[in-house]
Each structure stands twice: as structure tokens, then as C-alpha cells.
Amino acid sequence: MIKHFLEDNSDDAELSKFVKDFPGSEPCHPTESKTRVARPQILEPRPQSPDLCDDDVEFRATLWSQPSDSQQYFCPPAPLSPSSRPRSPWGKLDPYDSSEDDKEYVGFATLPNQVHRKSVKKGFDFTLMVAGESGLGKSTLVNSLFLTDLYRDRKLLGAEERIMQTVEITKHAVDIEEKGVRLRLTIVDTPGFGDAVNNTECWRPVAEYIDQQFEQYFRDESGLNRKNIQDNRVHCCLYFISPFGHGLRPLDVEFMKALHQRVNIVPILAKADTLTPSEVDRKKCKIREEIEHFGIKIYQFPDCDSDEDEDFKLQDQALKESIPFAVIGSNTVVEARGRRVRGRLYPWGIVEVENPGHCDFVKLRTMLVRTHMQDLKDVTRETHYENYRAQCIQSMTRLVVKERNRNKLTRESGTDFPIPAVPPGTDPETEKLIREKDEELRRMQEMLHKIQRQMKETH
């Protein structure tokens, strides 16, 4: 049989044993007329060249010796086993892709890698708002956080110009890349906030700007081309609190209460180098008590998962206890104990920006950039934006119901009910508010009709 032409000491001894034990190698008998059957071929590895890797082994065909009529023929051997076949070219992206795991490994464990590659290719957006009165170091702190100069084109106003200055909204956008990860950072500044003698409702332009970004995103999301939506929603607001005083001022309370339902507020105790360590602790405790007393909802750190390591839990607890963050900003590099650090030089010593014993700058940067940036974006999308979106849909629904009821009454009575005009003698400010509200209602009604048409076309 097979032993007639395969010797035990030959190179094909293992093949003989494999064919004998292999369940799919059924013997094939020649026909009764003893017709000469073509000689079968087997693949035998050629000696490997030093230029070839393990995955590029070539095979050559060798002919067997002339079989006799009584010999049996068998089917070709099975394909290469998983342990000897070439690995996938995606193996470097799949840490679980190994020959030993092929029988039980499906491959969906690579989904995080796929999401990571796609996210890195697309890049990330983050919009940060800084608010507070002038002179608290907002621009310096932002430049220190992201190691870039975002205010190189800023024009400093004189004393007379500051008197007449009103609250403005300015945007500074910059692309930052670090280790192949691209971040499109937008800084929203509020020059003029809190600088006037009468600061009544000076927070209103800031609230209107946040609502405008929500409205623009809602319009883009409701349109047909939703693939390239630019996300300009404000993800975080750093509110700077003056170190001079005994706690929160009425303006601070009014601002945070007006915006805490619209944006994630992170309170900042500015210019911490003007306070002693004991004063910093007392002022932090006082600010936390007043925030709770006035019902202000600042950004809440998410609870740690049960499977988090102890170091991360301790770090998260330290961040929670540091609210409000007492920070120092500086773009100056000074010499301290034989090394160059960013800080401020005083006659009595050096204050280092990145020294945790001097201020909370490192903790703020860790929270804002390294650990909670994505959570800030998630809370903005899932809470603040959804609240605005729900209000818009409810308003549009009420408008549609009101319009349908009016049309129904018109059809039943056969007469039109004209929209009542503005009563005579109304002051100009009230007329302006009424016109703005009517214009807003018309825009929302048009948007609802547009959504309804798109839904009909889709179905």
C-alpha cells in the first residue's frame, strides 16, 4: 500500500502518518480497465532563502515514483493548519490575533482600535469659554494651559475706552497637534464683563451666545447634510472669581445661576499668589458653602467605576476637593534651583505655576485636558443641549397646535381672526421685544415645517 513507495526514513514519513490518520483522505481505486491514472503531486517546502520571511515560503512540486496497479490513490492533504499558516497583515493592529486563539477568537475585541483610528483621523473639537472681570489673568491662564499664544493679535484698550466698553464675545481658534492627535481648540472670551459701573444683566450676551450655538447646531442637525456638522457648542466655562473679598459677589451669583443650566461651569479662584495658603483654604471653603446655599449647579465630576485602580480614585477625590481651583498663570520662564520653570519672581521667592504645592494649575489641567475633557463634551451633548432641544420641540409643537386650532375655527366660522396688533401706547422697548418674539416664533415654525417635509420625503 502506501508503504510500498514511502519509506519510514524518507522526508515524507510524516505525510504518510498524516494521511493515514486524516479522516478525509478516502482511498481512490483505479478503474477495472487499469487505465493509466495521472500521477498525483504533493507540495514539498523548498529550502528557505535568507531573503524570505516565514510568511513567504515557496513550494515546489515533486513527482512520485511509478505506482503499480495494486496501489491505492488518495486525496491531497488538508490545507495548512492555523499554527503554520501566514498571519493576517492586520495582526499588528490586533493584539489578540494569534494562531493559538483562532478557534475561539472572533475579532470584535478590535473595535476599540477601530474607533481609536477613526477618531484620531477625524480629530477632536473643544470649545472653552472664559468669563470674569478684567485683570484676573484669564488670557495668561489659557496660554499656560495649552502652551500656545492665542492672544497675540489682541489690542489693549485705554482707560477711556474701557469706560464705554460693553460686553463682547470674541473667538480665538487654533489647531493643536500632540503625538499625532489633532485638537481644534476654540477659546470664547468675554471682554468687558463686569467692568462697568452698572453690571445689571451683563451676563445676557453670554447666555444669548450659548443659545445661538445650540440653535445653529439644532438647525444643522435637522438639515439634510449632517455629515460635516461643525460643533461650536460651548463645552466648558471657566468662571474667574476675584481673590479680593470674602466670597462670591452678587454678580458672581447672578452669572452662575443664569448659565448653570446652559453650560458646564468650573469656578476658578484667580491670582492665588496674592493669598497665603491658609487664606486660600478659607476662601475655598466659603465659596463652596455659598455655591451650595444659592443652589448653583457647577460641573459635577462623575463617580469612579468600581474596577478603577486606587491611584485613579485618589486622584479623582483630590480633584473634587480642589473646587474652586486656585490657579496662577505665567508665560515667563525663570531660574529656580538650577532649573528653568514657568512662574513669577518676587523679592521673597519664586512662585512656580506647575508646582502642586503652590497652586492648583496642574490639577486644573489634568481635569480639563487629560481626564474629563470627553466627559465635559458628553454632559454638554446629553444634558444641556438636549434640554434646549426639548424646549425647541415643545415650542414648535405648541405653535403647530395653535395654528391648527385657529385654522379649524376659521373654517367653521368662515371668517379670519387677524393677529391682534400691538396695543397703542406701548413703549418702544416692549414693541421691540414683541417683534423679536414674533420673529423667533416664525423661525421655529418654518423649521418645524421643514422637518415635517423631510420626514414625509423619507417615508
From Swiss-Prot:
Pfam families: Septin. The modification Phosphoserine is found at S10, S49, S98, S99, S306, S413. This is Septin-4. Keywords: Cell cycle, Cell division, Cell projection, Cilium, Coiled coil, Cytoplasm, Cytoplasmic vesicle, Differentiation, Flagellum, GTP-binding, Nucleotide-binding, Phosphoprotein, Spermatogenesis. It comes from Rattus norvegicus (Rat). Residues 189-192 are annotated as: G3 motif. The modification Phosphothreonine is found at T415. Residues 18-52, 70-98, 410-430 are annotated as: Disordered. Belongs to the TRAFAC class TrmE-Era-EngA-EngB-Septin-like GTPase superfamily. Septin GTPase family. GO terms for biological process: brain development; cytoskeleton-dependent cytokinesis; flagellated sperm motility; hematopoietic stem cell homeostasis; negative regulation of stem cell proliferation; neuron migration; positive regulation of apoptotic process; positive regulation of intrinsic apoptotic signaling pathway.
